[in-house]
Amino acid sequence: MLNLKILALGIAVLGVSLGEGILVANIAKSAARQPEMYGKLQTLMIMGVAFIEGTFFVLLASTFFVG
């Protein structure tokens, strides 16, 4: 059962990393196109990263309760 938890965490980390990378890359592209919007984009980026990380921490906590 421990091996499945490790596999689930590995897949979750992969998803979190990809999601954050895509988010930050698109924010950087948007800021390059419209530099005057950087403040609002930065706020949205921080909120987006927080939600993505929050999803990971929910999965991390749930792996301790399963099994």
Swiss-Prot record:
Record lineage: Bacteria, Bacillati, Bacillota, Bacilli, Lactobacillales
Keyword Phosphoprotein: no
Gene3D superfamilies: F1F0 ATP synthase subunit C (1.20.20.10)
HAMAP family xrefs: ATP_synth_c_bact
Site (Reversibly protonated during proton transport) location in chain: 53
Transmembrane segment boundaries: 6-26, 46-66
Organism whose genome encodes this protein: Streptococcus mutans serotype c (strain ATCC 700610 / UA159)
PROSITE patterns: ATPASE_C (PS00605)
Pfam families linked: ATP-synt_C
Membrane topology recorded in Swiss-Prot or TrEMBL: Multi-pass membrane protein
Protein name as catalogued: ATP synthase subunit c
Note: Dicyclohexylcarbodiimide (DCDD) binding to the active glutamate residue inhibits ATPase in vitro.
Family: Belongs to the ATPase C chain family.
